């Protein structure tokens, strides 16, 4: 084992490395692992041999898909790193890792600056209020420009960067950094062997003025954050390195600003100072403080847990992974208390007991067994049967439910048909395991065709899931064409609609009458349905009310136009009637279901389609073709801007029009343009498109 798990939480950092696809995140993580002594053979993403990219496809595709948790040590501090993917189809991985991090390193490409995916990941980090430091990577690349990248952090992210280093040289002549906190040059001149220690030098004469200018900006920012420091600064006294670092740390932990460093991970330059900055400026579990949750069965009663060994045990499961030998691994962040292997805990989310088999701290896909799990750390557990992503584990005598995670619904679906009978059986196992691991992966049975339909966040996401079925579970299957996950909704209010369910066939019959109102609705937290009971005076017995709600929700699975799920509506149960003998839960469920269907037909039903936020980067000369093409795909151009010599077009385009776009774009621009897209929102489809969708769905 590397070193004992540190119990002094001041010396622990739980961080993520977040970036755009090719900003060099995996290489940066690799270097961190090398310099912290975990990894003795360096893996390059270019060769497909990186430590954190441990699934076969990640090695092939050179992109990080699964956030592996890695533990390492630096100057007597423990760093637990969650590697996050930089591809938009894997937003679920980013979301779930950000939920359990205390801080993050945002890696930017020194030539490209802030790219579309960086913006999205940055927004997700802001959602969970994760403090960040910025590492401007690839300073050795042709066209790398540190000052341009810092400006893009201001312009594109609306963030406040605090420059702590200036680059010495650029491109092939990038030799190191000027440290503005200690006012010294830290250099790695020429070609540097991995692990080489930097040389400390005087600041080069040609950078002296620039260093003085940026040092002054740094000191002003530091002085403004603290009255004592301001008095000292205006009295002309020197601020000590400790005072400067303390002030930067405080502002970083409060997300008031974001320290910026630079380097070239690939060329082994700038990694050690970045690790120092992780320790100096990013928060430890004690800085984050207590975590909030609610009592079991009562969301109004707020409970808290402090990051201490002496508190009752509480943890959040943030990832499930399949392991070739151990089966199901559950990654957890422990927020309070301690637990031993073999102990029984409560899954408060599901109300079930679980027994922990073994405990590990992970290093990519190697396991280090530990004999206790303590507050503030990240572990992998074996033996949990019912726990899934977002579940709370806690002490049985002190239950608490921690805030879970919200995951978007899939926007794209494909049908999948096993080739043989044995493939059919294996497919069942594969789907169950993959669905456990990935909350944005959905599975349903198309009742008309009998086909299994799987859904995900994009074409690449589904490609990789199908690929994993083949490799890991040996399932051979035919995969259909991608289909868009449409939705249906209503546009008008129906004040009153009544429905009576009556059946008389010898003996006791069935009777239920409901009167409902239906109206468009969107909840604050993104909820797409609300049920309100307005029945008074026992017109419908209390025990039958939930059946009406359940029936309505069943009916919402299949909309009234083309059979797509109904969303964004509120159902109010106004009145009704029952029969002492013939009424039952089942009768009211049927009545609720039929009433909703009939009312929805009167409520101006429409079809919704997913719109994607598309960003195309293209050379100037192809701009007209690109815009014309997006318009022909029903795209709405949102903005155009210039970025590092190229033009950028931002548009909202229906997902149904984006299949095969990459090939068309390449042929129109001779392979010189690229694009990214992320799900944006659902919007009503135009009438002519709606007709086509309905005709296709109903076979007319």
Curated annotation (Swiss-Prot):
Q: What is one GO biological process annotated to this record?
A: ribosome disassembly
Where found, per UniProt? Cytoplasm
Concerning SMART domains, the annotation shows: EFG_C, EFG_IV
What residues does the tr-type G domain cover? 10-286
Q: What is its main location?
A: cytoplasm
Q: GO CC: one term?
A: cytoplasm
Q: Which InterPro entries match?
A: EFG_II (IPR041095), EFG_III (IPR009022), EFG_III/V (IPR035647), EFG_IV (IPR047872), EFG_V (IPR035649), EFG_V-like (IPR000640), EFTu-like_2 (IPR004161), G_TR_CS (IPR031157)
Q: List the Pfam families hit by this protein, alphabetically.
A: EFG_C, EFG_III, EFG_IV, GTP_EFTU, GTP_EFTU_D2
Gene Ontology molecular function: GTP binding; GTPase activity; translation elongation factor activity
What residues bind GTP, as annotated?
A: 19-26, 83-87, 137-140
Q: Does the keyword Nucleotide-binding apply?
A: yes
Recite the UniProt keywords alphabetically: Cytoplasm, Elongation factor, GTP-binding, Nucleotide-binding, Protein biosynthesis
Q: Does the keyword Transcription apply?
A: no
Q: Which family does it belong to?
A: Belongs to the TRAFAC class translation factor GTPase superfamily. Classic translation factor GTPase family. EF-G/EF-2 subfamily.
Protein role? Catalyzes the GTP-dependent ribosomal translocation step during translation elongation. During this step, the ribosome changes from the pre-translocational (PRE) to the post-translocational (POST) state as the newly formed A-site-bound peptidyl-tRNA and P-site-bound deacylated tRNA move to the P and E sites, respectively. Catalyzes the coordinated movement of the two tRNA molecules, the mRNA and conformational changes in the ribosome.
Q: What is this protein identified as?
A: Elongation factor G
